[in-house]
């Protein structure tokens, strides 16, 4: 299940800012970047809607897997997990989260990816 629109982070300016100044948390299979939100970087139609939770994005490049089917499965798995973990956490409103999978992530079991995601969220102060 995909992230709801209110939780999605979109736009190249947001991604560029997260890459430049976001606080990084490294794992074996992914990198998590977190920063306070900057609404001026969002598109005008998204600025009007206040966020009830943090906004999240996933980056899964073709280096992870050449097969789009595999990348989409990983994306759906992590979207569902992020939704379950963060959707009802109002205390996290005002933060942006970017998760980038490393090429080695394709060799990991789904349970290992979810465990690492949880540990990175906890180290970033977003865990439960």
From Swiss-Prot:
It holds the Pfam family Ribonuclease_P. It comes from the Bacteria. GO terms for molecular function: 3'-tRNA processing endoribonuclease activity; ribonuclease P activity; tRNA binding. It is an enzyme of class 3 (hydrolase). Its EC number is 3.1.26.5. Keywords: Endonuclease, Hydrolase, Nuclease, RNA-binding, tRNA processing. Disulfide bonds: none annotated. Coiled coil: none annotated. GO terms for cellular component: ribonuclease P complex. InterPro entries: Ribosomal_Su5_D2-typ_SF (IPR020568), Ribsml_uS5_D2-typ_fold_subgr (IPR014721), RNase_P (IPR000100). GO terms for biological process: tRNA 5'-leader removal. It catalyses: Endonucleolytic cleavage of RNA, removing 5'-extranucleotides from tRNA precursor. Belongs to the RnpA family. Consists of a catalytic RNA component (M1 or rnpB) and a protein subunit. RNaseP catalyzes the removal of the 5'-leader sequence from pre-tRNA to produce the mature 5'-terminus. It can also cleave other RNA substrates such as 4.5S RNA. The protein component plays an auxiliary but essential role in vivo by binding to the 5'-leader sequence and broadening the substrate specificity of the ribozyme. This is Ribonuclease P protein component. It comes from Parasynechococcus marenigrum (strain WH8102). The gene is rnpA.
